[in-house]
């Protein structure tokens, strides 16, 4: 009986020491838990074709990259992400590529800065973006 009590106590202490929080993918440093936003072109909302797969790939200054899926109206919602500055690339995959390109990429000229406490972001795609 003592062995069972020791095992239970050891397990509980392990949870207390190591925690059972969210997996941060091995990232060490400050993060935000959730945020949302949208992409714009010349200050106007962007619409993507229904069924088109659109992702904003962001590159943290630490070298880590993350994919942010966008909805047809250019909106996004994300769980955790490291605080800091990001370079960005917009990737679009058409619903039915046919004979055209299977994926197009656009380098977003501005950078994204994730800040502690900020929950809403607007990302301007820049004057050279072609809807």
PLM feature segments, named:
Residues 38-50:
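Structural motif
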Residues 94-120:
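Structured interaction patches on ligand/partner-binding surfaces of diverse proteins
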Residues 82-85, 117:
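A glycine-anchored, Pro-Gly-centered beta-turn/N-cap motif
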Residues 17-35, 99-104, 129:
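Beta-strand-rich domain onsets/edges
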Residues 1-18:
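Sec-dependent bacterial lipoprotein signal peptides
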Residues 84-98:
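A short, solvent-exposed beta-strand micro-motif common in secreted/extracellular proteins
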Residues 66, 71-80:
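Short, surface-exposed beta-strand/beta-hairpin micro-motifs centered on an aromatic residue
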């Amino acid at each position: 009986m003592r062995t069972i009590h020791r095992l239970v106590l050891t397990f509980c202490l392990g949870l207390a020491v190591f925690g059972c929080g969210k997996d941060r993918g091995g990232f060490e440093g400050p993060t935000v838990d959730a945020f949302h936003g949208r992409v714009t072109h010349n200050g106007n909302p962007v619409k993507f074709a229904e069924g088109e797969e659109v992702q904003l790939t962001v590159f943290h200054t630490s070298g880590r990259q993350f994919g942010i899926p966008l909805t047809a109206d250019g909106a996004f919602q994300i769980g955790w992400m490291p605080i800091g500055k990001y370079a960005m690339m917009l990737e679009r995959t058409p619903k039915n590529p046919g004979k055209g390109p299977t994926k197009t990429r656009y380098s977003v000229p501005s950078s994204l800065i994730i800040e502690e406490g900020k929950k809403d972001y607007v990302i301007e795609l820049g004057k050279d973006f072609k809807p």
